[in-house]
Amino acid sequence: MNSDARHPVPLARGGYVARMAVGREDLRAAQAMRHVSFVDAAGREAMADGLDQDAYDPLCDHVLIEDTNGRLVGCYRVQFFAAPEDLSNSYSAQYYNLDGLSYLRGGFLELGRFCVTSDAADSDVLRIAWGMLARLVDLYGAAILFGCSSFSGTDPSCYAAAFDLLGAKHASPRISTLADETIGFQTSQKNPADRAVALGQIPPLLRTYLSMGGWVSDHAVVDREMNTLHVFTGLEIAAIPPARAKALRAIANG
């Protein structure tokens, strides 16, 4: 973990506490939860140690979300980049050419490996997760929150309506691909598939991004290793509607 990072104090709200991971035990707890979400649930071969871990973990700061009994119900990791030229060291840069973000002035905060337990109240966990993210954005002075938003499995037909909607309403050509296998979106389509069906196919975290003015790449990457499809996702802080920004900061302030 990035021991040099500035850490916000824990955030308590709605029966949950969000805090920064401290030490190896906290990190292993997050990696074990991630194994359930990104290995077991994805039908991938289990890791011998039961942990989902990679070379980016030591570079990141990890956020844990616990209930009042101290049970881990959610986690994610973040990595901060001060300048566009540093983005090549991000997780997303394995799959996407991030040169298209060089117009931004300010820092870049990458969010990844977001997951919650299946029995957690998603809305409450998401709310406090975003509250802690708001604190981190303010702490680092980030101009954009970005990452890869994943769809389970690698069959694009399962997400046809979602991809139609993303292509028609939310896609940007500024991020090109570095991946070998991609699925392009129809960005010229004026009448996407039924919106309710499309939104039902979009993961909750990505729906939240979009509701705040976020945008996605004009293609999805097929990630065979993770058994997912994912899209680059960007949320420029200045583009968040004032009412949403105010609500987020109200949560962040506890």
Describe each region flagged by the PLM.
Residues 81-214, 220-228, 240:
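Acyl-donor binding region in acyl/amide transferases
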Residues 54, 159-163, 231-235:
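Short low-complexity, flexible loop/linker segments enriched in glycine and/or proline
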Residues 5-73, 80:
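Short amphipathic alpha-helix that is part of the acyltransferase structural core
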Residues 64-66, 77, 232-236:
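Short, well-ordered beta-strand micro-motif
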Residues 232-254:
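Long, continuous compositionally biased terminal/linker segments
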